Protein backbone atom coordinates (compact mmCIF):
# COMPACT_ATOMS: atom_id res chain seq x y z
CA UNK A 1 0.00 0.00 0.00
CA UNK A 2 1.29 3.46 -0.92
CA UNK A 3 0.93 6.01 1.85
CA UNK A 4 2.38 8.99 -0.07
CA UNK A 5 2.50 9.62 -3.82
CA UNK A 6 5.05 11.52 -5.86
CA UNK A 7 2.41 14.15 -6.63
CA UNK A 8 1.82 14.67 -2.90
CA UNK A 9 5.56 15.09 -2.43
CA UNK A 10 5.78 17.50 -5.38
CA UNK A 11 2.94 19.66 -4.08
CA UNK A 12 4.42 20.12 -0.60
CA UNK A 13 6.05 23.54 0.02
CA UNK A 14 9.25 21.92 1.35
CA UNK A 15 9.68 20.00 -1.90
CA UNK A 16 8.86 23.08 -3.92
CA UNK A 17 11.55 25.04 -2.12
CA UNK A 18 14.38 22.54 -1.85
CA UNK A 19 13.93 20.20 -4.82
CA UNK A 20 13.37 23.14 -7.17
CA UNK A 21 16.56 24.68 -5.82
CA UNK A 22 18.53 21.51 -6.55
CA UNK A 23 16.88 20.81 -9.91
CA UNK A 24 13.31 19.57 -10.38
CA UNK A 25 14.00 18.25 -13.90
CA UNK A 26 16.94 16.24 -12.55
CA UNK A 27 14.85 14.89 -9.66
CA UNK A 28 12.10 13.71 -12.01
CA UNK A 29 14.57 12.19 -14.47
CA UNK A 30 16.19 10.29 -11.59
CA UNK A 31 12.80 9.05 -10.40
CA UNK A 32 12.09 7.63 -13.87
CA UNK A 33 15.55 6.02 -14.00
CA UNK A 34 14.91 4.55 -10.54
CA UNK A 35 11.59 3.11 -11.66
CA UNK A 36 13.28 1.28 -14.56
CA UNK A 37 16.18 0.16 -12.38
CA UNK A 38 13.82 -1.06 -9.65
CA UNK A 39 12.49 -3.66 -12.08
CA UNK A 40 15.99 -4.78 -13.03
CA UNK A 41 17.17 -5.07 -9.41
CA UNK A 42 13.87 -6.34 -7.94
CA UNK A 43 13.48 -3.31 -5.67
CA UNK A 44 10.23 -1.76 -4.45
CA UNK A 45 9.45 0.88 -7.12
CA UNK A 46 7.58 3.07 -4.64
CA UNK A 47 10.61 3.42 -2.36
CA UNK A 48 13.01 3.74 -5.30
CA UNK A 49 11.11 6.52 -7.07
CA UNK A 50 10.55 8.52 -3.88
CA UNK A 51 14.19 8.24 -2.83
CA UNK A 52 15.42 9.19 -6.30
CA UNK A 53 12.97 12.10 -6.53
CA UNK A 54 14.11 13.46 -3.15
CA UNK A 55 17.80 12.49 -3.33
CA UNK A 56 19.07 16.08 -3.70
CA UNK A 57 16.61 17.77 -1.32
CA UNK A 58 19.55 18.65 0.95
CA UNK A 59 21.55 20.60 -1.64
CA UNK A 60 23.02 23.91 -0.75
CA UNK A 61 24.47 26.18 -3.43
CA UNK A 62 28.01 27.38 -2.82
CA UNK A 63 28.88 30.77 -4.26
CA UNK A 64 32.12 32.70 -4.41
CA UNK A 65 32.09 36.31 -5.57
CA UNK A 66 28.46 35.93 -6.63
CA UNK A 67 29.14 32.91 -8.90
CA UNK A 68 28.31 29.24 -8.37
CA UNK A 69 31.55 27.51 -7.41
CA UNK A 70 31.38 23.79 -8.18
CA UNK A 71 34.78 23.10 -6.56
CA UNK A 72 33.75 24.88 -3.36
CA UNK A 73 30.56 22.83 -3.37
CA UNK A 74 32.51 19.57 -3.78
CA UNK A 75 34.85 20.51 -0.90
CA UNK A 76 31.99 21.28 1.50
CA UNK A 77 29.27 18.94 0.31
CA UNK A 78 27.02 17.32 2.93
CA UNK A 79 23.80 17.45 0.90
CA UNK A 80 23.09 13.75 1.36
CA UNK A 81 23.22 14.11 5.15
CA UNK A 82 20.95 17.16 5.18
CA UNK A 83 18.72 15.61 2.53
CA UNK A 84 18.19 12.33 4.36
CA UNK A 85 16.95 14.18 7.43
CA UNK A 86 14.84 16.66 5.46
CA UNK A 87 13.24 13.90 3.36
CA UNK A 88 12.53 11.75 6.42
CA UNK A 89 10.74 14.61 8.19
CA UNK A 90 8.75 15.42 5.06
CA UNK A 91 7.72 11.81 4.46
CA UNK A 92 6.62 11.31 8.07
CA UNK A 93 4.70 14.61 7.98
CA UNK A 94 2.85 13.43 4.86
CA UNK A 95 1.96 10.07 6.45
CA UNK A 96 4.58 7.71 5.03
CA UNK A 97 5.05 4.47 6.96
CA UNK A 98 7.99 5.03 9.37
CA UNK A 99 9.92 1.97 8.12
CA UNK A 100 9.57 3.11 4.51
CA UNK A 101 10.55 6.67 5.43
CA UNK A 102 13.70 5.32 7.08
CA UNK A 103 14.60 3.16 4.06
CA UNK A 104 14.11 6.13 1.72
CA UNK A 105 16.18 8.39 3.99
CA UNK A 106 19.02 5.86 4.11
CA UNK A 107 19.00 5.55 0.31
CA UNK A 108 19.24 9.35 0.09
CA UNK A 109 22.05 9.39 2.65
CA UNK A 110 24.06 6.84 0.66
CA UNK A 111 23.29 7.91 -2.92
CA UNK A 112 26.69 9.59 -3.17
CA UNK A 113 30.05 9.12 -1.57
CA UNK A 114 31.13 12.71 -2.20
CA UNK A 115 31.14 13.54 1.52
CA UNK A 116 32.58 10.26 2.80
CA UNK A 117 36.23 9.42 3.45
CA UNK A 118 37.86 7.23 0.80
CA UNK A 119 36.88 3.61 1.15
CA UNK A 120 34.49 1.00 -0.06
CA UNK A 121 30.81 1.48 0.63
CA UNK A 122 28.48 -1.52 0.53
CA UNK A 123 24.99 -0.54 -0.59
CA UNK A 124 21.79 -2.57 -0.43
CA UNK A 125 19.78 -2.92 -3.68
CA UNK A 126 17.54 0.13 -3.02
CA UNK A 127 20.56 2.29 -2.26
CA UNK A 128 22.29 1.02 -5.43
CA UNK A 129 19.24 1.86 -7.54
CA UNK A 130 19.13 5.45 -6.25
CA UNK A 131 22.88 5.95 -6.76
CA UNK A 132 22.67 4.51 -10.30
CA UNK A 133 19.62 6.64 -11.13
CA UNK A 134 21.51 9.76 -10.06
CA UNK A 135 24.57 8.76 -12.09
CA UNK A 136 22.40 8.09 -15.15
CA UNK A 137 21.31 11.74 -15.23
CA UNK A 138 24.58 13.45 -14.28
CA UNK A 139 26.17 16.13 -16.43
CA UNK A 140 29.66 17.64 -16.10
CA UNK A 141 30.16 20.31 -13.41
CA UNK A 142 26.71 19.71 -11.96
CA UNK A 143 24.88 21.11 -14.99
CA UNK A 144 22.03 18.61 -14.45
CA UNK A 145 20.94 20.73 -11.48
CA UNK A 146 20.18 23.67 -13.77
CA UNK A 147 17.81 22.09 -16.30
CA UNK A 148 14.34 23.51 -15.91
CA UNK A 149 10.84 22.11 -16.18
CA UNK A 150 7.46 23.78 -15.84
CA UNK A 151 5.25 22.85 -12.89
CA UNK A 152 2.59 21.66 -15.33
CA UNK A 153 5.00 19.31 -17.11
CA UNK A 154 6.45 18.13 -13.80
CA UNK A 155 2.99 17.27 -12.43
CA UNK A 156 2.10 15.41 -15.62
CA UNK A 157 5.30 13.36 -15.54
CA UNK A 158 4.97 12.55 -11.84
CA UNK A 159 1.31 11.56 -12.25
CA UNK A 160 2.39 9.20 -15.04
CA UNK A 161 5.11 7.75 -12.83
CA UNK A 162 2.67 7.38 -9.91
CA UNK A 163 0.44 5.31 -12.22
CA UNK A 164 3.37 3.12 -13.31
CA UNK A 165 4.38 2.53 -9.69
CA UNK A 166 0.80 1.71 -8.64
CA UNK A 167 0.50 -0.76 -11.52
CA UNK A 168 3.83 -2.40 -10.69
CA UNK A 169 2.85 -2.73 -7.02
CA UNK A 170 -0.54 -4.22 -7.93
CA UNK A 171 1.18 -6.88 -10.02
CA UNK A 172 3.42 -7.99 -7.14
CA UNK A 173 0.71 -8.40 -4.50
Language-model-derived ranges and their functions:
Residues 1-3, 18-46, 54, 96, ...:
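Divalent metal-dependent phosphate-bond-processing catalytic cores, especially two-metal-ion Mg2+/Mn2+ enzymes
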Residues 4-29, 64-71:
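Active-site flanking loop/helix segments enriched in acidic
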